[in-house]
């Protein structure tokens, strides 16, 4: 039997439990030492992962025919060593009753099974006893012949291989870093099952990529083959990126490998090699994840927040506004307060639509104070979508060169749905923050920001919003207090007190427009909706139950499009007996346009929806169109705006903005003042 010799060594038992149960955060930390920048040759007990063999919790003997091998071997050994026994099975069977535990079933079938099991064990024990004698008195060749004769003729047993297969054997297997990475990442539970099935100790040494297998001699080769079979389906692909991106990826290859579930490494000056075990995700999905993560690296100017190391939820109040976020691993204790205060950063929580990130909230620092320099002509942009990032242009020149004659496009600070929503990714140097400081996530230089642009199709009549897989708990309820803006503003949002996961009927808040100079009111209603897999559904696949009071109730089916669904909701809330305002029925066409992602395991995508107000201003041969929209992800109203220019304009883009609105005033989170002066 396998002896627990390795367990007697001074090895961290917590590490054993970690990997034996499931690959947890501790296992992910060990993956980091696999990359090339790790220290080699130093064997630390914390770098050893022990997967012990399976041992039954109960020490009592199991009922026959499921007798433990421990009991059978011990009983046979006792019978062989007993001087009163004449080494014959007849004598053994006569004494079975005296040795058999009371807990063993004494039925005829169970007794017969016990006799057969004991017979084999007894023969093996006698064989071991004979082998000791032959080892002393005979040569190895003579011993082998005698053992084979005993087994084949006298004991009626046929063997396959060495007769000493039950002896303990140790095998060292050396893996490459790539194989060790996938072994720890995806196959810890499989390795645990292998060790339990074959009663083998498996010791993983992360320091030198070595695996030690301690098991019965006949099982060592089997365990080694099963472990090697894990790496038969590895595939690799090389992608071309810019040198700027390659540098970011190379510096953060370990964290990116963990998050993308693939081995990421630099293969050239501007090439990245991706190795994956197919079955998890395709190369295209990994590339999309990698791009999203790199954007986060660039925006935060910090290492990517490790989801496995996120600790308790924190909150603090700044400028009369309360921020909730999860403390990342690089801010320990209370140092995050000092860090925020020194950097004048607020914590603006944002979520990417990438599947790998929906479980956690990522924190993006956003400067509180805007830039003061009003030299609008100093705005320059660089196209980060192209490999050559050295050339920069004035924003107005870039607009004309990239989008040609009549231009209609969107800006956004969010990196969500990059392939669907954005065609260009830009960085701009702002002498004057056209988009306001709360609009963009800055890095080291508060006057330099990255944003995303998409050429807008004429067929699109509404804005896009951000899609997420879950309703985030940090969503806030904001109100625009300016009456002028509210006159044309109609929105349906989730109220802030409706976000607890324990609530079955979250609230919907209706902001009614102003009529004849008076605010008609703000009403709060309840939505009753179905639940699926423990998540609240905002837009279910089948139907939505709308409830205003205990007596007013309506079910709206979602069997057409999202637009039709929203129109039904608006018409239900806009009935004359409710609002006394016929204008609300016509306002449903101004709701934001959404499209759900096709998925079999998710049932809702829309985070919030609201009406937007559009303003048109024309000067000479040019005109500008801009829209006010509220995005709860960044606590900023001006997360999207639209600019429309014509090529034969007698004034440039900056002169138009300066002359009409004097630049966009920044949005103060302290008092939520008006967006447009």
Swiss-Prot record:
InterPro entries: SLS1_C, Sls1_KH-1, SLS1_N. Pfam families: KH_SLS1_1, SLS1_C, SLS1_N. Residues 1-41 form a transit peptide. It is found in: Mitochondrion inner membrane. GO terms for cellular component: mitochondrial inner membrane; mitochondrial nucleoid; mitochondrion. The keyword Transit peptide applies. Disruption phenotype: Decreases protein level of mitochondrial translation factor mtf2. Protein cox1 absent. Abolishes growth on the respiratory carbon source glycerol. Keywords: Membrane, Mitochondrion, Mitochondrion inner membrane, Protein biosynthesis, Transit peptide. It comes from the Eukaryota. GO terms for biological process: mitochondrial translation; mitochondrial translational initiation. The keyword Thylakoid does not apply. Translation activation factor that as part of the MRH5C complex specifically recruits cox1 mRNA to the mitochondrial ribosome for translation initiation. Component of the MRH5C complex, composed of mrh5, ppr4, mtf2, and sls1. Proteins mtf2 and sls1 form a subcomplex that serves as a scaffold to bring mrh5 and ppr4 together. The MRH5C complex associates with the small subunit of the mitochondrial ribosome. This is Mitochondrial translation factor sls1. The lineage of its organism: Eukaryota, Fungi, Dikarya, Ascomycota, Taphrinomycotina. The gene is sls1.
